[in-house]
Amino acid sequence: MNNPWKNLPETQPYILPSDYELIDFENRNLSHDTIIQHHVLPEPYIGDPNAPIILLNLNPGYADEDVAFYNQKHVRILWKKNIHHSSMDYPFWFLDPSLDVEIGGARWWQTKLKEPIKTAGLQKVANRVCCIEWFPYHSRKFARLNKIIDSQNYGFHLVQKAISQKAIVIVMRSEKLWFESIQELRSYKHIYRLNSPQNVAISRKNCPTGFPLIETILMS
């Protein structure tokens, strides 16, 4: 499947042409908290989708500080390389040490991946972990749209490819939606859940069945 994100407009609104009509319609009825924030760059996935560890999340959140974060030239360069699946030293680009870890997604992800980073270091985690979002656009709170938008199918394709490559899959949030969208996940042997979908830290305590395997992969 071709990568549709190469067609994302370079100016606002940051919505794929194939998604625009439905998102524009839905946004008219969404609340302040659930409206889709198309003035910041979307995050359909973070990292190399061929990584051996795949995290399944719901959608990228939104805070007011994200505007300044994504407007940084260096951030936009890293974001574009990621979205195009270009070669990077830190494919999970929120772990790139050149970023300010006190702002935006860099702070959030370094907190959630604290134990894997402590185990293997930033670069190994950045090269062996990928997160795929069920819904690619930012919002303060998630609200399911009435239909699947076109770009979601590419994310589903990446997960199906990861399954075929026998990656381990960690469900961070919204198992029900992921299982509805990708039937293969229901019977997949290498899938693990977190004890707390509210605190989605990837840790031994929060993912007791999967974390030992994560450690093994990171240290190999």
Regions found by a protein language model. Give the residues of each.
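Active-site and ligand/interface coordination hotspots across diverse enzymes
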Residues: 1-99, 152-154, 158-160, 181, ...
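Glycine/proline-rich loop-helix segments at beta-alpha junctions forming the active-site rim
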Residues: 1-7, 117, 127-220
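Short, flexible coil/linker elements and helix-boundary hinge sites characteristic
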Residues: 12-13, 121, 166
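N-terminal start-of-chain detector that recognizes signal peptides
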Residues: 24-29, 101-105, 141-142, 164
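A short linear-motif detector with a strong N-terminal bias
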Residues: 32-35, 107-114, 148-150
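Residue-identity detector for glycine
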Residues: 47, 61, 104-105, 121, ...
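Low-complexity, serine/threonine/proline-enriched polar segments
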Residues: 75-130
